[in-house]
Amino acid sequence: MNVLSGAMRYATPWRTYRRLLSYAREYRWLLVVAACGALLEAVAGSTFLALMKPITNETFIERNREVALWLPLGIVGLFLLRGIAGYITDMAMGRAARSIARDFRVCVLTKYFRLPGSRFDGEPVASMLVRLGSDSEQVAHAVIDAMKVMVQQTLQVIGALVVMLWYSWTVTLAILLVAPLLAWVMQRVAKRYRRISHHIQESNAQLMQAADQALSNYQDVKVYAAQESELERYARLANINLGLAVKVESTRSISSAAVQLLGAVGLAMLLLIAGHEALAGRLSPGDFVSLMTSMIAVIPALKQLTNVQNMLQSGIASAQRLFSVLDSPDELDTGRRPLGRARGLIEFRGITARYPGRSAPVLDSVSFVAAPGTVTAIVGRSGSGKSSLIKLIPRFYEPESGQILLDGHPLQDYLLADLRRQIALVGQQVMLFDGSIADNIAYGEMRQVVSEEIERVVVDANAQDFVNQLPEGLQFQVGVKGGRLSGGQRQRLAIARAMLKDAPILILDEATAALDNESERLVQDALQRLMPERTTLVIAHRLSTIKHADQVLVMDQGRIIESGTHVDLLARDGLYAYLYSMQFRERPT
């Protein structure tokens, strides 16, 4: 079977970030508003720094009473303007960030629905949930939140440098000699953050997967007293995650300390050169205070720009994980032949299929015909290829060689959506969704059916007795995965769903294997109403349920080794007769 390679190809960080920014295009007006707000913030901050000269010279040296009166009012006005501008920036950026996170979640889930079934075998659900959850949130941080910090603090630095250049360009240029060293520090920090961020996201997925397995199977964990081993496994993964988080904190702390040290070097140079300029009469006390205040304002801004690398690189790592999904090829859907309602003639011609990494095929030269209105039972030992064969009909997988025909045409000739409309599936593990009974029966494209149709199939599926006993009837909430219903009740709702779909092809995948006798009788009775006038394929675990099948296919190691009716196969005394006798032989008492 064709399966996507597990290898992930990452683009360069800059190309990834540029691609991320394309998702912000739809919200460019919000970003323009935010940029205007950030610019106003920077102007207000720079104006305050520039005012340090008149505050010092006019108030403390010249003792100008008029300036001493209007300066406090001007400062209050500046900070009021800065607060309003900051609010506008935060609101616009926040709305854009959350919108982008939502867009990524919807896009990625939409893409997962278009991927081939092999992807779901190769990637744990926990990893998918991490992509939809924290990865999407990290991307929003990288696109918007990191951008906000970079824009705000960069404008703050530029504004402070303009003030410094205005009052003494010689002092400012001398201080800027430390800029190349600062750029080198930030580059090294970015590379380290990016490397660690990839590992952290993978570690988060492993943590979620371990917790999901332990909690989903809590009954087995308790019965087999496996709490300690599960906790040890989870703690080991949590310790790995902790180690990575500590590396992030270590990198952040060291980079912040390095920036502060470079800032201190800049301040020392400022004091040295400014003192020389003051002695030469080229620098007033007000000039010096403005320079010093501007330099002090630059240091925390540079520190934030260094720290934003963590947010930015984590977002880029998450974006690369998301883009690895979005760039994966969709399941093949190249058919153009329209299909209203099929007759249901299914023909397998020399089908061979193989799982990746396995030399032996899971299906080997399988050929048979299932005529409309007939029941084809598929039996065999575990691992003989029964479920793999069934999954080829809705094209969840593609065969390696051979052809599968529906009504005389290859499955690939039909549109996937049209093909799957012809199929109803009832499996052993029935998946119900959190919602009402009515919602679970009238599922997907059947949502618009009238309530009378739902009530009819509930009766036909032998589900009316337990539905009528529920406090809200068809509006009863079944809970997550149908957890408020028994296995037999869930199975009958799945049959009701298949009845409502009224598809010409019915696939039953061991639909009664895990039921008690009473539930099995009710389900079998409902299936007898469902199967007539359809092409039915049954994977049977209990061989007593297929005695009346039109043909029985016996599989072993991916091949059909026997075929015929129940009576014919018993008479041949082959594998089918052996399996049947193993189920029904009398044991000595």
UniProtKB/Swiss-Prot annotation:
A Gene Ontology molecular function term of the record: ATP binding
Annotated NCBIfam families: MsbA_lipidA
Subcellular location: Cell inner membrane
Record-linked PROSITE patterns: ABC_TM1F, ABC_TRANSPORTER_1, ABC_TRANSPORTER_2, MSBA
Keyword terms: ATP-binding, Cell inner membrane, Cell membrane, Lipid transport, Membrane, Nucleotide-binding, Translocase, Transmembrane, Transmembrane helix, Transport
Family label: Belongs to the ABC transporter superfamily. Lipid exporter (TC 3.A.1.106) family.
Protein name as catalogued: ATP-dependent lipid A-core flippase
Reaction it catalyzes: ATP + H2O + lipid A-core oligosaccharideSide 1 = ADP + phosphate + lipid A-core oligosaccharideSide 2
Function comment: Involved in lipopolysaccharide (LPS) biosynthesis. Translocates lipid A-core from the inner to the outer leaflet of the inner membrane. Transmembrane domains (TMD) form a pore in the inner membrane and the ATP-binding domain (NBD) is responsible for energy generation.
Occurrences of domain ABC transporter (ranges): 346-582
Domain notes for this protein: In MsbA the ATP-binding domain (NBD) and the transmembrane domain (TMD) are fused.
EC assignment: 7.5.2.6
Assigned GO CC terms: plasma membrane
Membrane topology: Multi-pass membrane protein
The ABC transmembrane type-1 domain, residue ranges: 32-314
Top EC class of this enzyme: translocase
Assembly and interaction partners: Homodimer.
